[in-house]
Amino acid sequence: MSTVLPEDSVGLVTPQIARFDEPLALACGRSLAAYELIYETYGELNASASNAVLICHALSGHHHAAGYHAATDRKPGWWDSCIGPGKPIDTNRFFVVSLNNLGGCNGSTGPSSVNPATGKPYGADFPVLTVEDWVHSQARLADRLGIQTWAAIVGGSLGGMQALQWTITYPDRVRHCVDIASAPKLSAQNIAFNEVARQAILTDPEFHGGSFQDQGVTPKRGLMLARMVGHITYLSDDSMGEKFGRELKSDKLNYDFHSVEFQVESYLRYQGEEFSGRFDANTYLLMTKALDYYDPAAAHGGDLAATLAHVTADYCIMSFTTDWRFSPARSREIVDALMAARKNVCYLDIDSPYGHDAFLIPTPRYMQGFANYMNRIVI
């Protein structure tokens, strides 16, 4: 890319690392004696620390949400379309914090980190995590940054679950929750997709029970298959049909089982191979389990309205018409529960052909609705 950065970019950014030496008790019954969180910030924190916005990432996300690490970077952060001057999360107004969650593989302590007790990577011995664990670790980061109350917490997909959980766990520390393309818990179908993906990894001979780093190998085939399965669920049938149809890679069929014949096959293999070269298999297992386990209403007999009775935040819930992974009906479950609990909520169902991935794609109505809500937040 050009060395001249776009005017609406947050510009060049440098990741920072916060180290915590206080033990963090986890839902699984174990604890981490010490850990690190990598994060980035965009914009300036005001004198009263009232303009802070937390970005919570989805399954394969990370801390680099906006801007560039170098002027020669080919692409900006994963949500650059939404974060920056004049964008929905306007860095002329807000101080934005984006982190890589605990258990991740982009700089925060996770399975690929060295376990100080053994001198080897944690691997499969890294504790199983929950959305609630992430929220507690994020609260410690907020304390470290001098942020008592977030102006808003924003997330899509798994990130939306974290945003919702913040309002439940720390109701006095969140003024606005923007929950996009999410759900209050996974359906049986979603859990099933995650299990297929996990089995692809667990049965890869190179997985070695999660200790593949000790063996100097990577379960790339399992990760590739997991990503291919997941990626299908992120797209709509219409968008796949429009993009690929039944187009062939060449002008004829090969009548074998090994050739890549259809364009959609080539695309999925590319996505899987690219992902398997940058993501950690144990982190993938952790992230999908955190998704499966999330069910905040379980503590109230499945009554989500009762679960949300004590929250104080205002909510913006957004869904996308062709998202079948987290359908609009799942977002409306949250909206209905908030209304039953007599909370302030606005809901926008956006017509988009892009399926679950629509929360990453800056279509006009999405950007307008997102910006309209963020602009009304008083800082």
Curated annotation (Swiss-Prot):
One Gene Ontology cellular component: cytoplasm
Keywords: Acyltransferase, Amino-acid biosynthesis, Cytoplasm, Methionine biosynthesis, Transferase
Top enzyme category: transferase
Site features described as Important for acyl-CoA specificity, chain residue numbers: 325
Residues annotated as signal peptide: none
Superkingdom of origin: Bacteria
EC number: 2.3.1.46
Active site residues per record: 157 (nucleophile), 323, 356
Residues in AB hydrolase-1 domain copies: 51-360
SUPFAM superfamilies in UniProt: alpha/beta-Hydrolases (SSF53474)
Quaternary assembly: Homodimer.
Family annotation (PANTHER family): HOMOSERINE O-ACETYLTRANSFERASE
Family: Belongs to the AB hydrolase superfamily. MetX family.
Protein name (record): Homoserine O-succinyltransferase
Species annotation: Pseudomonas entomophila (strain L48)
